[in-house]
């Protein structure tokens, strides 16, 4: 375990030190500057609610690599007035060491994400929920969806993962959730997707997948 933790710290330090990937120019000022979005907790109900969990060490509750670009792309697909974007904050700190835990994140992070799904369901009973997670955030969403009640889980129409840390363990899907409603993006050379905790440059390239991921989520909402 000591060796694993040492490897984890040295490998994931690259993520903390890396310069953010350039983001689309049409993102909201809030997302660009703060890496956060609280449309669900602070705003009015929308037709679609995106719940997103950022990667380790990323700023805000949406991060920078893929969270804000995904939100922006989904709003472009479905209409800015139709989509609420909500990042997972609270007890999810995005710390490095949590990646080495059995669920590849900690119980507090999972509980925080789960509560957001439940809030979307109760506060906005007519909203269609979609979700996404990057790096450690993919484990947060994966585990949270598994813990949802059948009623809430049925409202989750689609999930996208980027650099899925549980890709090998969960066979590219979320246990007990429709496989066709999950799309996993694993860049060539991203060893995180192979069941390791080794971060390579490929792990930081997922910004380019925002349009395709948004199209997938939009298709699930529109076909529901």
From Swiss-Prot:
Write down the EC number: 3.1.1.74
Which PROSITE patterns does its entry note? Answer: CUTINASE_1 (PS00155), CUTINASE_2 (PS00931)
Q: In the record, which residues are listed under signal peptide?
A: 1-18
Q: Does the keyword Transmembrane apply?
A: no
- Which Cys-Cys disulphide bridges does the record give? 45-124, 71-85, 186-193
Q: Which reaction does it catalyse?
A: cutin + H2O = cutin monomers
Gene Ontology biological process terms from the UniProt entry: carbohydrate catabolic process
Gene Ontology MF: a single term: cutinase activity
Localized where? Answer: Secreted
Carries keyword Transmembrane helix? no
List the active site: 135 (nucleophile), 190, 203 (proton donor/acceptor)
Q: State the top-level EC class.
A: hydrolase
Primary location class: secreted
Please report a single Pfam family linked to this protein: Cutinase
Q: Which UniProt keywords apply?
A: Disulfide bond, Hydrolase, Secreted, Serine esterase, Signal
Q: Where is this site: Transition state stabilizer?
A: 56, 136
- GO CC annotations, alphabetized: extracellular region
Question: What does the sequence similarity comment in the record state about its family?
Answer: Belongs to the cutinase family.
> What does the UniProt function comment say about this protein?
Catalyzes the hydrolysis of complex carboxylic polyesters found in the cell wall of plants. Degrades cutin, a macromolecule that forms the structure of the plant cuticle.
Instruction: Return the protein name.
Output: Probable cutinase 1
Q: What is the lineage of its organism?
A: Eukaryota, Fungi, Dikarya, Ascomycota, Pezizomycotina
